[in-house]
């Protein structure tokens, strides 16, 4: 057996897996971020101990624990900073292993780990080389080459949400710079584009009925119904993302792009909007990359964490 753990800013998702990759049980605990997140690892250990007791499984039968975290992780398991958890710099693999009776621990960045999950058991399982793009509140990414996470020199590989895509942008991204991909293709980015269209044009669109409360889902739903304004927003978003993918493709030449995160619930409609622009802008040798939806949903991080141990 092994544990796959996905630590988010509000909840920790835990999964007990067979080493063959079957999810046997999954559950959640609250992420206690107070006091610089000092309780998070002990809460995880308690949750794992309780599950072993409940299932009658000995710790000797556990191959290890994989853990995905919201921040850059170096190749030796050092967390550089997890702002969402209140953590500074320390070696999370050593610390968790020490707390959980010396068990093997592997840690990775959450977006990279989710990509590994999709590559192992999800939308990318037919491929060795994939790029996963997660469109949520922000935009995350993960690059899998020959079945392994490409982390780069100090864990920064795959941070595609912060690719610079627009010189004319005046709003700042969360990272402090202007013109990042995340500002145009995340759920918040789609809403921003919609509000900009409503505020700066007289275009007739049902988006106006939602006013300030419009969501990315509303935009995609209206676009599917043929609303011209919503379609313009989706087309703009697809142009930014498809073009960014063509830039990524000439560097890593993946067999497939896997699109996940909340925005991907728009389904094939979203894929079509991206794919056309990707094909139009990418170098010919990279043009046949498949573009698929992720299939593991919120469980991708758990699967990927388990894959770091079992795969």
Q: Which positions does each model-derived feature cover?
A:
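ATP-binding/phosphotransfer module of carbohydrate and carboxylate kinases, centering on a glycine-rich
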Residues: 1-64, 73-76, 94-105, 117-127, ...
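Short beta-strand segments
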Residues: 6, 66-70, 108, 132-138, ...
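Short hydrophobic alpha-helix segments
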Residues: 27-29, 83, 153
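Gly/Ser/Thr-rich active-site cleft segment
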Residues: 64-91
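Short, flexible active-site-adjacent loop segments at beta-strand->alpha-helix junctions, enriched
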Residues: 71-73, 85, 111, 155, ...
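Active-site nucleophile and cofactor-binding loops and adjacent substrate-binding regions
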Residues: 83-89, 106-112, 132-135, 292-298
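Adenylate-forming
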Residues: 114-120, 141-143, 162-163
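Structural signature of FAD isoalloxazine-binding scaffolds in flavoprotein oxidoreductases
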Residues: 156-160
């Amino acid at each position: 057996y092994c544990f796959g753990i996905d630590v988010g800013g509000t909840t920790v998702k835990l999964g007990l897996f067979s080493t063959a990759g079957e999810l046997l049980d999954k559950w959640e605990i609250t992420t206690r971020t107070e006091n610089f997140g000092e309780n998070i690892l002990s809460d995880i250990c308690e949750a794992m101990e309780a599950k072993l007791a409940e299932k009658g499984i000995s710790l000797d039968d556990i191959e290890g624990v994989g853990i995905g975290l919201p921040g850059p992780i170096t190749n030796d398991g050092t967390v550089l900073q997890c702002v969402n958890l209140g953590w500074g710099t320390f070696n999370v693999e050593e610390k968790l292993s020490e707390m959980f009776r010396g068990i093997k621990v592997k840690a990775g960045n959450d977006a990279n780990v989710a990509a590994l999950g999709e590559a192992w058991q999800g939308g990318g399982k037919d491929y060795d080389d994939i790029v996963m793009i997660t469109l949520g509140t922000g935009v995350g990414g993960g690059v899998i080459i020959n079945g392994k996470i490409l982390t780069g020199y100090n864990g920064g590989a795959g941070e595609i949400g912060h690719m610079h895509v627009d010189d004319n942008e005046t709003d700042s991204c969360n990272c402090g710079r202007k013109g990042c991909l995340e500002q145009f293709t995340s759920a918040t980015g789609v809403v921003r584009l919609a509000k900009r269209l409503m505020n700066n044009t007289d275009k007739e669109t049902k988006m106006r009925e939602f006013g300030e409360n419009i969501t990315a889902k509303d935009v995609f739903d209206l676009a599917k119904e043929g609303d011209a304004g919503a379609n313009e927003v989706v087309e703009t978003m697809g142009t930014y993302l498809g073009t960014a993918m063509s830039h990524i493709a000439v560097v890593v030449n993946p067999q497939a792009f896997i699109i996940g995160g909340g925005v991907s619930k728009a389904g094939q409609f979203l894929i079509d909007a991206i794919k056309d622009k990707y094909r139009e802008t990418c170098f010919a040798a990279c043009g046949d990359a498949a573009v698929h939806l992720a299939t593991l949903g919120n469980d991708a991080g758990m699967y990927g964490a388990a894959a770091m141990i079992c795969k």
